[in-house]
Amino acid sequence: MLFLLLEGFLMLVFTVLDLILFYIFFESVLIPMFILIGIWGSSQQRIMAAYQLFLYTLLGSVFMLVAILGIYSQAGTADFLVLNTLEFSTSRQLVLWLAFFASFAVKIPMVPVHLWLPKAHVEAPTAGSVILAGILLKLGGYGFLRVLLPLFPEASAFYTPLIFIMSSVAVIYTSLTTLQQTDLKRVIAYSSVGHMGLVTLGLFSGNLQGIEGSIILMISHGVVSGALFLMIGSVYDRHHTREIRYFGGLVYTMPLYAIFFFWFTLANIGLPGTSSFVGEFLVFIGAFQTNTTVTVFCMTGVILSAGYSLWLFNRVLLGNPKTYPLEMTYDLTRREFYYLLPCALTVLWLGIYPNVIIDVLHLPVSTLLYQSSF
């Protein structure tokens, strides 16, 4: 029931055309997620993780609510179609932009307001982590596309250097932090923050390639990270632990699992032939046109991400095989295979033939850039 409620709120966020309704459903997502983590979390820290998620999101939403009230008092409407035709003064844009940014930055999340995410992932049940990584994080990116870029183009251009700096810090910092993690879920959680740093880099590049790349990267990240959390859930069901030091040599007892894990690891790195490569490549092309120095720093972070991803695969799947009880050594079940296979094929399909998405994105992204003059 909670998952259906959560999915319903998420669908409404992406479909409403009214700013007030957008805010209501944007924040309503928090309620079922709070309950899922607080009740069905995996350890005694679940209450703290749920409250952190609640407080971080609530703090950002206060600023967004004040900004919405300010817009409604001036425009007399909350309809996106009408608001897109209005022009706000530069000074008002700068203030309103910051208010909305405070909420979207927490949700996506950006460094330094990302601390709730690793704890939420660690404590959430597997299905909760999949929805959190696959869809919930994308609400922030959607907010940038739906609100900040079209309604406040001058402010978006003004704050682009700030976004670029925060994005580069996120990519480098999370890549280094991930190398120190000992929990499987924390590794994927911190890598998600780094990938979202690349998303914000592309969204504020101000060109077609960057924005299209960010959207593709969000889609790819949703599939890849969701699949990785499902695979972590599979080994947790067998071994009842996510501590990396406990594992080793699983390739010998779970060869099919190892194949899927290796494929999604390559996708997480952004190897050519995967959907993540298409998104990252377009993001870097777009960002390179805006700020070469920051883009080079972010490329360094991508190299570091390859390091921790391959280290994780080597530590868990390869190495000296450890002795496990017989009931822990069985390979993927038929159910697990059938929900991982579509994810793997999607990553391959979008990596080989990305035009299926790019062709759809050309018109709306071009319209966004033309109308906002960003």
Labelled PLM ranges:
Residues 5-92, 177-190, 194-242:
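Alpha-helical multi-pass transmembrane bundles of energy-transducing inner-membrane proteins
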Residues 118-120, 124-128, 136-222:
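Acidic, glycine-rich loop-and-beta core segments that form the ion-binding/anion-interacting portion
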Residues 8, 59, 144, 263-266, ...:
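Hydrophobic residues within the alpha-helical transmembrane core of Major Facilitator Superfamily
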Residues 225-228, 289, 293-331:
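Predominantly late transmembrane helices and immediately cytosolic-facing juxtamembrane segments
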Residues 193, 336-356:
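Final/C-terminal transmembrane alpha-helix of multipass membrane proteins
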Residues 55, 98-105, 132, 162-166, ...:
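Hydrophobic alpha-helical transmembrane segments of multi-pass membrane proteins
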Residues 23-24, 54-55, 131, 164, ...:
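Hydrophobic/aromatic positions within or immediately flanking transmembrane alpha-helices
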Residues 46-48, 62-119, 144-162, 210, ...:
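Juxtamembrane/interfacial segments at transmembrane-helix boundaries in multi-pass membrane proteins
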